[in-house]
Amino acid sequence: NSEVKYSTVQNWYSGDENGKGGIYNFVTKRGLCAESNSKISWTQVETGSAITWKYPSCILAGNNSKGEFYSVALTNHYQQADTGSKMIHIGKNSRSKIISKGISTGNSINSYRGKVKVSLNASRARNYSQCDSLLIGNSSEANTFPYIEVYNRSSIIEHEASISKINEEKLFYFMQRGISIEEAISLIVSGFCKEVFTELPLEFALEADKLLGLKLEGSVG
C-alpha cells in the first residue's frame, strides 16, 4: 500500500530569442510498483532549457498497482520539448493515467511521446491517456506520438489527443471586457493547465502558474 509522489518545476536557461545558448535537459526517471496496491505519481512542469527530453516511467509489477503522470510543457522562441511517459503493465488489475498539456508559441516545437504496454499476464489492466496541445501564433508546432502495445485481451486502453489554437475571436472576447491580450493568454493557458496544477502541492502550483505567465509575455504581437 505504499505511495510515492514526485513533483518538479523546471525552468533552466532556455537560450536567447534567436535560439542560441541554453541548457540541454535530458532526464531519466523510473519507478517500480513492486507490490500489491502500490502507487507512483509523477507531476512535472517544464518551461525552461533549450532542449528537453523527459519520459518518467512506471513499471506496474504488483497486482492492483497504479501509475500516474501529469505534465505541462511550455515552449517559446526556438525551444524544443519532447516529453511523455511510459506505463508498463505487468500486474493484474493495474491502472495507469497520463495527462499531458503542451503549449507552443514562437518558433518552438512541443511533442508528446508516450508508451503504454500491457503484458500477457496483466489481466484487466486499464490505461487512460489524454494529450492536449495548445498553439499560440502561426509558427509553433505540436506533435503527438503514442505507442501502444497490448498482449492481453481483457485490458482496456483509452487514448485521446487534441490540438487547439488561441484564435482572434477568443482574444477579442477578453478585450471587450477590458482585459489585455497578454493577460487574456495567461488566463486561457492557466485554465488549460488546471488539471495538472491541481496535482501539485499548493506552493508549487502558485509558482508554476506565475512562471507560465512570465514565460508567455510577448508571445503575441
Curated annotation (Swiss-Prot):
Entry similarity comment: Belongs to the iron-sulfur cluster assembly SufBD family.
Name of the gene encoding the protein in the UniProt record: ycf24
GO CC field: chloroplast
Name of the featured protein: Iron-sulfur cluster assembly SufBD family protein ycf24
UniProt keyword annotations, A-Z: Chloroplast, Plastid
InterPro entries listed in its UniProt record: Fe-S_cluster_assembly_SufBD (IPR055346), SUF_FeS_clus_asmbl_SufBD_core (IPR000825), SUF_FeS_clus_asmbl_SufBD_sf (IPR037284)
Lineage of source species: Eukaryota, Rhodophyta, Bangiophyceae, Galdieriales, Galdieriaceae
Main location class: plastid
Protein's organism: Galdieria sulphuraria
Cellular localisation: Plastid, Chloroplast
